[in-house]
Amino acid sequence: MGCAVSTARDKEAIERSKNIDRALRAEGERAASEVKLLLLGAGESGKSTIVKQMKIIHDTGYSQEECEEYRRVVFSNTVQSLMVIIRAMGRLKIEFADPSRTDIARQFFTHASAADEGILLPEIVLLMKKLWADGGVQQSFARSREYQLNDSAGYYLNSLDRIAQPNYIPTQQDVLRTRVKTTGIIETHFSCKQLHFKLFDVGGQRSERKKWIHCFEGVTAIIFCVALSGYDLVLAEDEEMNRMIESLKLFDSICNSKWFVETSIILFLNKKDLFEEKIKRSPLTICFPEYTGTNTFEEAANYIRMKFENLNKRKDQKEIYTHLTCATDTNNVKFVFDAVTDVIIKNNLKQIGLF
C-alpha cells in the first residue's frame, strides 16, 4: 500500500516538474521573441515619423477616423509655417515682391490669430494662397536654413487647394508629415517576422533627455536617428549649436555608454531626400570645415557616415549598422526595417549559440 502511494506521489512530482519546465520554456521562447527597441536622436531627426511608419507597415495603418483627428494638426502646421516664413522676412530684410501683399499679410495674421487653431477658414485660405505665391515669400522660404521651419512647410503650403476642401480628410502621407513635439516616452507595439516589438520613442530636445534612463534596462537594440539635412541648421533650443554636431555628441555618448556595451546600434541617416536637394546649394563645409570632398550626395553622405561610425570606441565588440533613410517614404522604411529585423534575429541566434 505504502509503495503504491509513493509511486503516485512520484508521478505527481514528475508531472509538476514537467509543467514547470514547460512553463519556463514557454517563458524563455516568449522572452526571446520580444524585442525592445529604443528610438533615440536629437530633436526633429524623424523619430516620430518612424513610429508612425511602423503603424502603417506592421499594423492596420491610420483609420479614416484617426486621419480625421489629424486634420487640426495639418491646418495648424500649415498656418504656423506660413507665419514663420513671413516673420523671417523682417529679419532677413526681404520685401514682398508685390507691395500690396503687406496689407494681405496683416489681414492674414489678424484672421489667423483670432481663428480657432486647427480650423482653416475660406477667407484665411484665400490670403494664404496670395502670400505663398509672392516672390518675396518664396525667397524667404528658400532661406529657411537661417531660421527654424518645419520640414513639412513646403509640402502643406503647396497642397493648400487640396487641404482647404470642405470634405478634406488627411492622407497617410499627410499624417506622416505632421509635426507635434514629442514629450515623455511613447511606447508602440507591433509584430514582424515572428518577433514582438516594443518601440520606445523618447523626446529628442535636450530638456527631455533625462527621462531616457527609464528605458535602458533590457533593450535589445537602439535605433539612432540623425537628420542628414541638419548639417547647416542650428538647434531649436540652442541657436549657437549646429544640429549635426549636436547629433554627433549625442551619438558618442550613447554608442560608448556603459549601459549599451552589449546593445546593437542601428544608425538611421534620415531625411536623405532633403539632404540630396540641399547639398547642391549648401556646402558640407558649413558643418565640417575640414571636408575637402565634392558636394555630391554620395560623397557627402559617406563622409557623414564615417564621422558617426568612427566614434565607436569598441569596434572589435560592437558593430554599427548604418542605413540611409527617408522616414516619409513608406517603401524605403519597410525595406530598411526588414534588414534591421534580420540583424536582430541573427544576433538573437548568436546569443543562444545557433549562429
UniProtKB/Swiss-Prot annotation:
Annotated segments matching region G3 motif: 197-206
Binding site for GTP: 41-48, 176-182, 201-205, 270-273, 327
Region spans: G5 motif: 325-330
Residues covalently joined to lipid (N-myristoyl glycine): G2
Region of interest: G1 motif: 36-49
Region (G4 motif): 266-273
Single GO cellular component term: cytoplasm
Domain of life: Eukaryota
Annotated region described as G2 motif, given as residue ranges: 174-182
SMART domains linked to this entry: G_alpha
PROSITE patterns membership: G_ALPHA (PS51882)
GO molecular function, one term: GTP binding
Gene Ontology terms: biological process: adenylate cyclase-modulating G protein-coupled receptor signaling pathway; asymmetric cell division; asymmetric neuroblast division; asymmetric protein localization involved in cell fate determination; axon ensheathment in central nervous system; calcium-mediated signaling; cortical actin cytoskeleton organization; establishment of glial blood-brain barrier
Residues involved in Mg(2+) binding: S48, T182
Disulfide bonds: none
Domain G-alpha, residue spans: 33-355
Alphabetically ordered keywords of this record: Cell membrane, Differentiation, GTP-binding, Lipoprotein, Magnesium, Membrane, Metal-binding, Myristate, Nucleotide-binding, Palmitate, Transducer
Binding partners and assembly: G proteins are composed of 3 units; alpha, beta and gamma. The alpha chain contains the guanine nucleotide binding site. Interacts (via GDP- or GTP-bound forms) with loco (via GoLoco and RGS domains). Interacts with raps/pins.
Function per UniProt: Guanine nucleotide-binding proteins (G proteins) are involved as modulators or transducers in various transmembrane signaling systems. Plays a role in glial cell differentiation during embryogenesis; loco, Galphao and the G-protein coupled receptor, moody, are required in the surface glia to achieve effective insulation of the nerve cord.
Family that this chain belongs to: Belongs to the G-alpha family. G(i/o/t/z) subfamily.
Name of the protein described by the UniProt record: G protein alpha i subunit
